Amino acid sequence: MAKQVIQQAKEKMDKAVQAFSRELATVRAGRANAGLLEKVTVDYYGVATPINQLATISVPEARMLVIQPYDKSVIKEMEKAILASDLGVTPSNDGSVIRLVIPPLTEERRRELAKLVKKYSEEAKVAVRNIRRDANDELKKLEKNSEITEDELRSYTDEVQKLTDSHIAKIDAITKEKEKEVMEV
């Protein structure tokens, strides 16, 4: 039972790190990537639909995204959604595709993005620590119900702590890499 608690904690921590990585993919780092538009939703016949479900997004150049909608009638809505999304890019529409030219980041914008990366990093670390707390609570219940001994409890909580430390180290490494990418001119 205790091994199962630790295994579940590991899986949850892995998911938290993956979610953090996905979150960072939406942070613009001066280069074009389709992940920038992941959170942009378009009002498509009354339903908020992610833009990547309504169009093909390609990266023909390092600083350009091309959005080719499957349905040309939503091109204006897509343009509005991109403008409203606070990505800091202005779409240009030629009737059949939308082009997004990603401007080089200003020093100020780089610092803002670095702060955002730190914020996401902190949220991910808190999520991992909450998982640790839940796992430790679960292990304490097992000890209270005499399913494991006090020594086993100590051993298992140490194992959970090692898991936590390794996942936080992963988050720190990912954060450092993304900050470097954001601050790169």
Curated annotation (Swiss-Prot):
One of its GO terms (cellular component) is cytoplasm. The keyword RNA-binding does not apply. It comes from Geobacillus thermodenitrificans (strain NG80-2). The keyword Cytoplasm applies. Pfam families: RRF. This is Ribosome-recycling factor. It comes from the Bacteria. InterPro entries: Ribosome_recyc_fac (IPR002661), Ribosome_recyc_fac_dom (IPR023584), RRF_sf (IPR036191). Belongs to the RRF family. Responsible for the release of ribosomes from messenger RNA at the termination of protein biosynthesis. May increase the efficiency of translation by recycling ribosomes from one round of translation to another.
